[in-house]
Amino acid sequence: MRLLRYLHDFRTLPFFVLFSMAVGIGIGKAFGISDYELTPPIDAIKDIFRGRYDFTIGNTLALGVVAGLFLMIYPAMTNIRVDDLGAATRSPKQLLIVAFANYAIAPFFMFALAEVFLRGDEDLHTGLVLYGIAPCIAMVIVFTFLALGNTPLALVLVAFNSVAQMILLPVYAKILIGNVDFDVLVVGESVVLYLGLPLVLGLLTRRAGVARLGEAGFERFREGLNTLSVVGLLFTLVVMFGLKGDLIVNDPMIVLRMAVPMTIFFFVMFNAVYVAGWRLGFNYEDAVAVAFNSTGRDFEIAIAIAITAFSPAVAVATEVGPLIEVPVMLSLVWIAMRSGQRLFAAPVAPLEAALVPSDGPGGAGGERRGAASSAPTWSERPRPM
């Protein structure tokens, strides 16, 4: 129980993140896979079903990205009711903000940052721009969940981004990069793998769990599932740093050169949209969901396109992305929860209290606030001065 509290406590979670990175780099060095050429997860799964996948140490570890993402997303999906999804679809203002941020601002903002910081390096420039044109369709649900945001709304926004980027991704690639030859179906396949499968299993788990254990019993069971999100996050970090640790050890300047514009992008986009949501009268949960859906980038799609349509150097540039994005987005979760206590009338519960069962009678102290609770109580912000 004490370990669970440490995992969910944002005062100690950064140490687990750093430890996972170090373990990943150590594993990569020990097995000689720290500069591994990644196969896009979708292609790897197809090859497995066709009986053509070579289960080397590196290839097997690479499948851990898929497993880690599932472990992160599935617990959040068990937190969702079908009725919550119906209510979340009636949020046109939130949807418009996400659409404007992701398709009118984000691609061009990332392009401007690439021009400022990477103008002399065509490969890194292309990799950064490519990373910026595709909104995230998976991990933003996890970060919304960790920040105690509106997970059903985040899911609806992700579904919108999934469809929109299938149409707009080739357009932005053409405008900002030039002629790019890639299959847009890879976006649809990623939606099924990272969104559809966890959603279906999560809804089925909730339905079966409530039928067998009752609402209160399932909530206590789900508190244990919540730990999988953090475990999946740390496991994904181990895998990514294990396969690409040489980027940091042998050529840290590549990471640093990519880290500066990417960190600026994430902090500016998140805080701008988060504050905009507050000013527009959103409650904390909605403001967080909208901000993360406007900030996160789809590194799986960016890497897949880079591998299939560009030089290896561009692929390396996109592979740096998640090494930077995940720790930065975790810091944004911390910022959201800290600032939420000041900006919004209803205080935001500490993360460890929200995700770990209490020691009191019944152990029900970990019930989350928000759309997934049986009686949602949305916080309302005070009128800005």
What are the language-model segments listed below?
Residues 1-366, 378-385:
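Alpha-helical transmembrane segments of multi-pass small-molecule/ion transporters
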Residues 366-372:
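Short linear segments in intrinsically disordered or otherwise low-structure-confidence regions
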